[in-house]
């Protein structure tokens, strides 16, 4: 048997169970390789770690370069796309201002102010005096409390609404009808 162990090559060991020379790479993954294979296994582990480190550093470097290139490319494309839009905005902006000035000059002669469309908008407002002057309807539900827009404002809105409704003659007649019905 010793003669057979001596006949195995440098990267092989003699397996006494099989009575044959077996490559050391098969036993390097185990915790305890044979004594004749320890030098081979230590060298192969070191080489594989060096290879793994080289691959990791290469992938890290490539991903860093690619991400930097994509960032620069996006920045340049945004800059190029925004320049024509600025030129168009300057051209259309001066045209709109000219139209607005012409419309304002025309409207100064009349009673109404007509603003150019797209520049501003107006909202019609109804004041309390306008609502009181208008003919009140008994069946309308505008005397109910309005929804509060902010937290904690419910009491304020309800109080103002009740005060407003008490001042309307139609609301007073509606509440008198409700009182007379409930008194029966």
From Swiss-Prot:
Spans of repeat TNFR-Cys: 7-41
Record's subunit section: Associates with TRAF1, TRAF2, TRAF3, TRAF5 and TRAF6.
Tissue: Expressed in mature B-cells, but not in T-cells or monocytes.
Source superkingdom: Eukaryota
Stored CDD domains: TNFRSF17
A GO molecular function held by the record: signaling receptor activity
Reported disease: A chromosomal aberration involving TNFRSF17 is found in a form of T-cell acute lymphoblastic leukemia (T-ALL). Translocation t(4;16)(q26;p13) with IL2.
Name of the protein in its database record: Tumor necrosis factor receptor superfamily member 17
Marked site: Breakpoint for translocation to form IL2/TNFRSF17 oncogene: 3-4
Membrane association type: Single-pass type III membrane protein
Annotated GO CC locations: endomembrane system; membrane; plasma membrane
Gene name of the record: TNFRSF17
Organism: Homo sapiens (Human)
């Amino acid at each position: 048997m010793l003669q057979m162990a001596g006949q195995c090559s440098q990267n092989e060991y003699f397996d006494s169970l099989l009575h044959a020379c077996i490559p050391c790479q098969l036993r390097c993954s185990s915790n305890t390789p044979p004594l004749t294979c320890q030098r081979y296994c230590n060298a192969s582990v070191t080489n594989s770690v060096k290879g793994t480190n080289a691959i990791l550093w290469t992938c890290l470097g490539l991903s860093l370069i690619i991400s930097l290139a994509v960032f620069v490319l996006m920045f340049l494309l945004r800059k190029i796309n925004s320049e024509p839009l600025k030129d168009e905005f300057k051209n259309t902006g001066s045209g709109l201002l000219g139209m607005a000035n012409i419309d304002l000059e025309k409207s100064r002669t009349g009673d109404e102010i007509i603003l150019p469309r797209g520049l501003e908008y107006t909202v019609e407002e109804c004041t309390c005096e306008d609502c009181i002057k208008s003919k009140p309807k008994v069946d309308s539900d505008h005397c109910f409390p309005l929804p509060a827009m902010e937290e904690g404002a419910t009491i304020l809105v309800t109080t103002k609404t009740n005060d407003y409704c008490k001042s309307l003659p139609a609301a007073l007649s509606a509440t008198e009808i409700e009182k007379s019905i409930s008194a029966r």
